Amino acid sequence: MSPQTETKASVGFKAGVKEYKLTYYTPEYQTKDTDILAAFRVTPQPGVPPEEAGAAVAAESSTGTWTTVWTDGLTSLDRYKGRCYRIERVVGEKDQYIAYVAYPLDLFEEGSVTNMFTSIVGNVFGFKALRALRLEDLRIPPAYVKTFQGPPHGIQVERDKLNKYGRPLLGCTIKPKLGLSAKNYGRAVYECLRGGLDFTKDDENVNSQPFMRWRDRFLFCAEALFKAQTETGEIKGHYLNATAGTCEEMIKRAVFARELGVPIVMHDYLTGGFTANTTLAHYCRDNGLLLHIHRAMHAVIDRQKNHGIHFRVLAKALRMSGGDHIHSGTVVGKLEGERDITLGFVDLLRDDFVEQDRSRGIYFTQDWVSLPGVLPVASGGIHVWHMPALTEIFGDDSVLQFGGGTLGHPWGNAPGAVANRVALEACVKARNEGRDLAREGNEIIREACKWSPELAAACEVWKEIVFNFAAVDVLDK
């Protein structure tokens, strides 16, 4: 026997490969209040038992690797390993299972969404034993929530800053999204804000291109919003997109926005990354700036039902990383979004405590403790005829954002803004009087048209515009 063999035998180390389920499938495990809990939709390869697939997810996203290693003996795997503690078959789907995994809190760096995602979804999605894998939900324990700053300000502070209460906020994305000069861009901002909108917005891919450098855009937009504020007596904002190629450049743009005295900046949090987003959120908290978040690239990650990460997880991650607004779909517009699923993650964005509710896709009860809420932003293919439904679906604590539905008005940008403001005020008034927006919505809009020619013109233009496509991501039966 060689010295090497003698050494291995003497420490009881047995090399080789063993099934994951022998170590990481623990149906007897009782979850702890401090565990991060995950619900994965697992589609195993043919011949792979669901218990082995669920255990493989737990192993590869925590302490495991493909073979036994001698350094396992230098730590306590029982303390640090992830555990697949329950598996459910998905009704109506062949070979799909929900695998529940518990992770000890010590596996994660405090205050770092980047580290949390690197661990839980960083490597396991390419695992050959799985045909497909989707992270459906996470339960973030209060002990971990308290390590995050979260949104720079939150819903109530934003309302106080803007002095706007009792209704949804109104916004507009400036179109065309690319190609305008900074001066023409600022002109559109001014006209929309003067017409009655609360916000205008840079589109997600407006950064600092040759046709419009960021500093020029910031200057003209600031001039526009201050002029609109003076004329209307209302506080206005424009989401100045600070997203950039480096964190240093991003912060430089946010600093310039603060020096101009504007109330809000913007970030593309998925393409920009969670580290950049958290950095910007901390700057905004320290310097009194609101932070609007765009979810560009989300559908690459969340749209397919059997693979990726559900948006409710990305929404939770954003609330932890930091943002005062985030785009959340519309239910009624041009973009993907089933009603019950959308309302489920809207509640996860806004509320302090959300109960488990599988009918809305919420797998775990979530307690946000004292983390501020985030305003959901309904944007994408919406117009004045959608206003009753949007007001009823999203309620007061939301931003309703009409891009083409403002700038596409036949009389111009300011009349388009007037039409949207009149429609919103009519819907809020009707709701407060006890009328049913879902049933009487069209009638409410027609009544308002009688005293608003701008709204009447908008209603005529968009009276036949609908987006009747079934959602791809729907609830399980």
Curated annotation (Swiss-Prot):
It holds the Pfam family RuBisCO_large. Substrate binds at residues 123, 173, 177, 295, 327, 379. The modification N6,N6,N6-trimethyllysine is found at residue 14. It is found in: Plastid, Chloroplast. The active site is at residues 175, 294. The modification N6-carboxylysine is found at residue 201. It is an enzyme of class 4 (lyase). GO terms for biological process: photorespiration; reductive pentose-phosphate cycle. Its main location: plastid. Its EC number is 4.1.1.39. Keywords: Acetylation, Calvin cycle, Carbon dioxide fixation, Chloroplast, Disulfide bond, Lyase, Magnesium, Metal-binding, Methylation, Monooxygenase, Oxidoreductase, Photorespiration, Photosynthesis, Plastid. The basic functional RuBisCO is composed of a large chain homodimer in a 'head-to-tail' conformation. In form I RuBisCO this homodimer is arranged in a barrel-like tetramer with the small subunits forming a tetrameric 'cap' on each end of the 'barrel'. This is Ribulose bisphosphate carboxylase large chain. The gene is rbcL.
